[in-house]
């Protein structure tokens, strides 16, 4: 292996000061135009703008949950708010010598540990901080600046044992508890080109080394259990992104950089190649934004963005068949026993796109059931594809977005009925 493993109350929002509005029932949103199925809006909190916000894998649109709180990052740092009331609980401490928050792990570990990356100076997103998501307490921090240029798109993932990063020229894993370096990625030769996929469970590396044998190779390493690893000789597709751990699903590409051919490649739990699907024909319109991509292990279905209007579509991962596609703008909120929960401005019923709807979608048949309308008197919500949305186990829907009227960013909580 080429890897070395040692493995009713209102708090006013003043300029620059965060606050929240707690709504009593639906009284704050009363009005003649209110739809009968309008979802109950529970609270709204300010979310100061950050230049780091975006839909990339580790941008400041991640939302974490613990037992009671929602945790998100913005221009004022990473903070926890009570999910029911919107009251702020804590803020992650900025390490000494660090600046604003750059990035967060897409999710915390099952044990409630998350990773945050701060600006280490000079717009270099290299200061790693690992936190307890129940208390906001910093477990450890590490400045990973390496003097080889500023890092603008750090990647960081967390599991029960390891915090893994690609920051600058550091491709490494650190123990969750103390931050000791437990593995480091090293090249197989002196003349190599590499592409890397990083996820909470796996490190995937495709290497093409003219001075090594085999010249081309895919290496898969389980990040929790160092004894679980495999190699695939002759792999010549470069890794674009890891889409899922269960099953391990890679988006890969080959051909020219100007017009590459993309593939979906899946692997067994033993690290052996399973299915490879070339994205041609209708499948070429699939878009794999990290926050709008979902893989269902049981159904073997992949859901991703689709088309020029930022809709959604589902593909059978065994056959490559496109199962369904949704027009308009849509965003994935989560999955529960009712199906895939999405926010859309263009439901299958053809309803008006003035107010976004929360809809459950059957994974295989694409059938929709409207759960309610996202209603605001001011109609300030943007298109779903411009929101970040997350659904918790209590069917509370959280939306990070900027108001259409004044571009003021904030977070809102809506209650979605189970029935």
Predicted segments with their positions:
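Flexible, glycine-rich surface segments
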Residues: 310-313, 323-331
């Amino acid at each position: 292996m080429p890897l070395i493993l040692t493995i009713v109350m209102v708090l006013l929002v003043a300029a620059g000061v965060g606050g929240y509005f707690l709504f009593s029932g639906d009284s704050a949103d009363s009005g003649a135009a209110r739809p009968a199925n309008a979802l109950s809006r529970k609270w709204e909190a300010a979310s100061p703008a950050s230049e780091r916000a975006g839909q990339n894998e580790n941008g400041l649109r991640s939302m974490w949950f613990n037992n009671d709180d929602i945790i998100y990052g913005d221009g004022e740092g990473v903070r926890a708010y009570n999910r029911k009331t919107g009251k702020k609980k804590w803020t992650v401490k900025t390490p000494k010598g660090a600046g604003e928050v750059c990035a967060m792990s897409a999710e915390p570990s099952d044990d409630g540990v998350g990773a945050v990356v701060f600006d280490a100076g000079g717009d270099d997103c290299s200061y790693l901080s690992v936190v307890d998501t129940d208390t906001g307490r910093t477990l450890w921090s590490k400045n990973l600046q390496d003097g080889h240029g500023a890092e603008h798109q750090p990647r960081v993932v967390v599991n029960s044992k390891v915090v893994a990063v690609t920051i600058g020229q550091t491709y490494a894993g650190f123990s969750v508890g103390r931050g000791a370096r437990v593995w480091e990625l090293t090249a197989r030769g002196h003349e190599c080109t590499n592409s890397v996929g990083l996820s909470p469970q796996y490190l995937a590396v495709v290497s093409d080394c003219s001075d090594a044998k085999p010249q081309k190779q895919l290496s898969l390493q389980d990040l929790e259990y160092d004894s679980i690893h495999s190699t695939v000789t002759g792999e010549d597709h470069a890794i674009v992104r890891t889409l899922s751990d269960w099953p391990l699903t890679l988006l890969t590409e080959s051909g020219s950089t100007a017009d590459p051919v993309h593939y979906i490649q899946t692997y067994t739990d033993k690290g052996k190649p399973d299915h490879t699907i070339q994205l041609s024909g209708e499948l070429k319109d699939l878009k794999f934004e990290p926050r709008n991509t979902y893989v269902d292990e049981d159904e073997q279905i992949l859901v991703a963005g689709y088309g020029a209007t930022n809709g959604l579509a589902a593909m059978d991962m065994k056959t490559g068949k496109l199962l369904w596609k949704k027009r308009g703008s849509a965003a994935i909120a989560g999955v529960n026993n009712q199906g895939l929960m999405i926010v859309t401005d263009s439901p299958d019923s053809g309803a008006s796109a003035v107010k976004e709807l929360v809809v459950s979608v059957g994974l295989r048949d694409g059938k929709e059931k409207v759960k309610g309308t996202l209603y605001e008197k001011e109609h300030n919500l943007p298109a779903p594809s411009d929101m970040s949305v997350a659904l918790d186990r209590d069917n509370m829907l959280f939306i990070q977005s900027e108001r259409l009227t004044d571009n003021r960013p904030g977070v809102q909580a809506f209650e979605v009925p189970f029935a």
